[in-house]
């Protein structure tokens, strides 16, 4: 039986999602908990919709794994949450057909990036939002964002150290909304390159403080050169929010 | 010069506010940062409006200390925040007259207690709100709360291990409001006994799940016996929110 689960994790104390020798990762904790549940010496392999970086959070990451256990789907979150550390939680589980694949069946992903602009640091947000205490021109940020919507070669918005050759992706939606204490960037796309969302967030924040004009983002895109785009915003403001599948 | 500061701290990694040998405390970190700022071998004593327990947070704790330094008041938060660990932040500072005392000048304190009732744990709230996934009758909780408003002997709502003899306090306001994902208790009073707010929160949650009737709170109060009241809700849902002074 194949199970599809929606999970959330606080990325603060993880070295990212993917298993890395000697490092604490989300995948490692999931596979350990599943091995206990299956009374198995061997790992139960878990597939996710994709990796997230060190410090990056997930409110709606999706995984799948195969299991011989006949636990009812709605009981799986309770069974796993009892074994998982408290910075990972299974929010929902459903039986998927065998053809389902957490990564290759995904048709769209949604990320959100949180910024707060208060004068002084907020201790309760220090791991969960980027403290950017500048006056921001949100209109300019929205203007700048428009240049990135659509299908483009996002080489300028991809970390240099990547093996991926084809850097064409499609961004469906990219907007900034004001929250009680700052801003939230919401972005959906066909898929995302390494650090792409964080570079976009950093670049649009540069537009917000007038370091670049909104239209410069267009030439940044066309340059196809990482050096052309702005800074990489820190990981702790970023959340994999949702992964969408064709039902 | 006496300085009055409003500070916040995330109680999760502290053994409470007050200095304790060999333990990490808020007061210890404050006094260390001040000693560095004053280039002093000795501690600069800090006085707070009162102690908070291990795991308990503060959004608006108030402290005072005396200093010969002539740093403008609005610069003190920046100077201290640069030296403090990131789970303590100075939010505001002002020069107080010499007669001001963070504890004895306080006329009213406000605490808030956060509960969330979602089915599964929320990793982002695990240190910041009490996960109480039961259906709650908020109306009963409000009815029960009414019995505690006013001036009473709160022995039943005070931890047994306390040296305080006089347990008469006045509660000015006590109400529950619904939040996006649970409930928030807001309580203001003349002062609070050891664990008093957490015992009140636990007892009113008992009323919310029908374990006690709202009117039983009245007899609990009259019993003047800790055993008569309900459970002590966990510390991580509790925040010292505000301390009020006669200006």
Swiss-Prot record, chains A, B:
Q: Which GO terms describe its molecular function?
A: pseudouridine synthase activity; RNA binding; tRNA pseudouridine(38-40) synthase activity
Active-site residues per Swiss-Prot or TrEMBL entry: 53
Quickly give the catalysed reaction: uridine(38/39/40) in tRNA = pseudouridine(38/39/40) in tRNA
Known EC number: 5.4.99.12
Q: What class of enzyme is it?
A: isomerase
Q: Keywords for this entry?
A: Isomerase, tRNA processing
Kindly state the subunit structure of this protein.
Answer: Homodimer.
What does the protein in this record do? Formation of pseudouridine at positions 38, 39 and 40 in the anticodon stem and loop of transfer RNAs.
- NCBIfam families in the record: hisT_truA
Family, according to the entry, reads as follows:
Belongs to the tRNA pseudouridine synthase TruA family.
Q: What is this protein called?
A: tRNA pseudouridine synthase A
* Originating organism: Bacillus subtilis (strain 168)
Q: What is the lineage of its organism?
A: Bacteria, Bacillati, Bacillota, Bacilli, Bacillales
Gene field: truA
């Amino acid at each position: 039986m194949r199970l599809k689960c929606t999970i959330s994790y606080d990325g603060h104390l993880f070295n990212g999602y993917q298993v890395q020798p000697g490092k604490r990762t989300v995948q490692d904790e999931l596979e350990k908990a599943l091995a206990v549940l299956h009374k198995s010496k061997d790992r139960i392999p878990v597939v996710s919709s994709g990796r997230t970086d060190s410090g990056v959070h997930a409110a709606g990451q999706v995984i799948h794994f195969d299991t011989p256990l006949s636990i009812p789907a709605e009981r799986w979150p309770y069974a796993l949450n009892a074994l998982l550390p408290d910075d990972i939680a299974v929010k929902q589980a459903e039986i998927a057909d065998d053809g389902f694949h957490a990564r290759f069946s995904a048709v769209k992903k949604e990320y959100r990036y949180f910024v707060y602009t208060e004068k002084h640091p907020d201790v309760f947000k220090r791991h969960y939002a980027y403290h950017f205490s500048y006056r921001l021109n949100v209109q300019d940020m929205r203007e700048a964002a428009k240049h990135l919507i659509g299908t483009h070669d996002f080489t300028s918005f991809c970390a240099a150290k990547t093996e991926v050759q084809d850097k064409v992706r499609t961004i469906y939606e990219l907007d900034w909304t004001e929250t009680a204490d700052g801003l939230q960037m919401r972005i959906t796309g066909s898929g995302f390159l390494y650090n792409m969302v964080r570079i976009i967030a950093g670049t649009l924040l540069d537009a917000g403080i007038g370091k670049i004009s909104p239209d410069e983002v267009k030439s940044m895109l066309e340059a196809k050169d990482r050096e052309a785009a702005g800074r990489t915003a820190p990981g702790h403001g970023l959340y994999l929010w949702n992964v969408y599948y064709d039902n």
